[in-house]
């Protein structure tokens, strides 16, 4: 009987004092992520969004416990933002209106030989720590830098943080914090004959004048290759043979915003309309579910320490193979 009472106490407490519990959770969340608001009205507005997100997370995880989903959600530092705000402030992929493919840039896989069933470039030392782009639409710069860092490690044996701010400020074909595209970044590094290190050109998360300095140059690029559009088999081959690959995805759903663990597959995730650039650093299988290992640029508080496992071979889920590319070094 005592065990039953212990089990019932949280339920009774929640039934009697739901607002007090929410108040406590809200204050704890604000403290955890150092949240401050300009006015009481602003805080009330943000709390309503937070409560709606918290409810969504709770319902999803209940469904996941019943086997409806292959992944779980968790509250994070984006809790007081709508999914629309996240896309507006924290993505930044801008695809050129006309993309010309040529034999010079198209990646033609060598289909001879098997690729490994799984690969994780984090374990091979090809991947730098997770970064946070902040509220600057510079995802394209972090994705590009991640692919360049992987190739630098492959060529020289040295893992080095390269400068996304160098790209934000200096790639004239892109729009800095207003968005951009990865192959434009690779072309810039090729034309510029280099990109600075993060130490030489630190990230500030806003548009500034181009301050590239050759004395801080840490890597070069001699071109790029684009994966055949929508071809996950070719993408797998590229990741296995080349290294980390820049990819674009649809990151517009609440389920993506609060991803925590498991293999992410949401049937509402668009395979046509992509809006966010990330980095594919490997692939594998978890509990029978094939996945890509994706490095995001929203800090370690997001996802699984900054990473997400995204469904692989599920009809190009979230458009992951639509705009994949990597630099040549």
UniProtKB/Swiss-Prot annotation:
One of its GO terms (cellular component) is extracellular space. It is found in: Lysosome; Secreted; Apical cell membrane. Predominantly expressed in osteclasts (bones). Its EC number is 3.4.22.38. Keywords: Cell membrane, Disulfide bond, Glycoprotein, Hydrolase, Lysosome, Membrane, Protease, Secreted, Signal, Thiol protease, Zymogen. It comes from the Eukaryota. It is a peripheral membrane protein. Residues 16-114 form a propeptide. InterPro entries: Papain-like_cys_pep_sf, Pept_asp_AS, Pept_cys_AS, Pept_his_AS, Peptidase_C1A, Peptidase_C1A_C, Peptidase_C1A_papain-like, Prot_inhib_I29. It is an enzyme of class 3 (hydrolase). The active site is at residues 139, 276, 296. Thiol protease involved in osteoclastic bone resorption and may participate partially in the disorder of bone remodeling. Displays potent endoprotease activity against fibrinogen at acid pH. May play an important role in extracellular matrix degradation. Involved in the release of thyroid hormone thyroxine (T4) by limited proteolysis of TG/thyroglobulin in the thyroid follicle lumen. This is Cathepsin K. The lineage of its organism: Eukaryota, Metazoa, Chordata, Craniata, Vertebrata. The gene is CTSK.
């Amino acid at each position: 009987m005592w065990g039953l009472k212990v089990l019932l106490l949280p339920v009774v407490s929640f039934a009697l004092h739901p607002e007090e519990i929410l108040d406590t959770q809200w204050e704890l969340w604000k403290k955890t992520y150092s949240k401050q608001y300009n006015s009481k009205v602003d805080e009330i507005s943000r709390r309503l969004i937070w409560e709606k997100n918290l409810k969504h997370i709770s319902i999803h995880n209940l469904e996941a416990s019943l086997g409806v989903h292959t992944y779980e959600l968790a509250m994070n530092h984006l809790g007081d933002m709508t999914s629309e705000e996240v896309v507006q402030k924290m993505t930044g992929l801008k695809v050129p209106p006309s993309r010309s493919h040529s034999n010079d840039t198209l990646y033609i896989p060598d289909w001879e030989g098997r690729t490994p069933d799984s690969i994780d470039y984090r374990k091979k030392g090809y991947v730098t720590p997770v970064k946070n782009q902040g509220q600057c639409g510079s995802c394209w710069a972090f994705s590009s830098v991640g692919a360049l860092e992987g190739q630098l490690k492959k060529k020289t044996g040295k893992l080095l943080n390269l400068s996304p701010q160098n790209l934000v400020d200096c790639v004239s074909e892109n729009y800095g914090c207003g968005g951009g595209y990865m192959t434009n970044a690779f072309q810039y590094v090729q034309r510029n004959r280099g990109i600075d290190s993060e130490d030489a050109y630190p990230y500030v998360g806003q548009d500034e004048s181009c301050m590239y300095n050759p004395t801080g140059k840490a890597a070069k690029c001699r071109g790029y290759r684009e994966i055949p559009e929508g071809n996950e088999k070719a993408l797998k081959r590229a990741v296995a043979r080349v290294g980390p690959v820049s990819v674009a995805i649809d990151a517009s759903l609440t389920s993506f915003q609060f991803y925590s663990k498991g293999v992410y597959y949401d049937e509402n995730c668009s395979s046509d309309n992509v809006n966010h650039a990330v980095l594919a650093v490997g692939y594998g299988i978890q509990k029978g579910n094939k996945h890509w290992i994706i490095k995001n640029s929203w800090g370690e508080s997001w996802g699984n320490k900054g990473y997400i496992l995204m469904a692989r071979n599920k009809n190009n889920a979230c458009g992951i193979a639509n705009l994949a590319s990597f630099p040549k070094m």
